[in-house]
């Protein structure tokens, strides 16, 4: 496993991924495509909430509870899961951001990204 992830490892993706842009809402950094939030950081920037399929999140949390937690009660209705940045390595954190972005963009953008990043976000 590589070095633990921090917000600076993933912040550039908020502006680099096609149609994505970073915003601050009540002091919290979020990444959006249009009006859809696909990544949101806690105020202290230790937790990264990410778009993730509802039907798969319980299994993800159960498989790696030291890394992933269920979202807050108000976010349970969304395709969302929380990740502890310190428990992730840099590559894993970047892959989670790209996977979250994939959930909110057209498939043609996903295919174009794959062609230009054959080894993933690194």
What function would you assign to each model-found segment?
Residues 1-122:
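Charge-dense, helix-prone N-terminal extensions
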């Amino acid at each position: 496993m590589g070095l633990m992830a921090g917000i600076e490892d993933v912040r550039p993706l908020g502006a680099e991924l096609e149609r994505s842009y970073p915003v601050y809402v009540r002091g919290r950094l979020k990444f959006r495509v249009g009006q859809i939030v696909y990544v949101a950081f806690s105020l202290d920037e230790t937790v990264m909430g990410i778009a993730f399929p509802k039907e798969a999140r319980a299994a993800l949390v159960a498989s790696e509870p030291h890394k992933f937690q269920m979202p807050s009660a108000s976010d349970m209705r969304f395709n969302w899961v929380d990740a502890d940045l310190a428990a992730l390595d840099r590559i894993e954190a970047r892959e989670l951001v790209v996977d979250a972005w994939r959930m909110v963009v057209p498939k043609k953008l996903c295919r174009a990204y794959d062609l230009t990043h054959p080894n993933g976000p690194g």
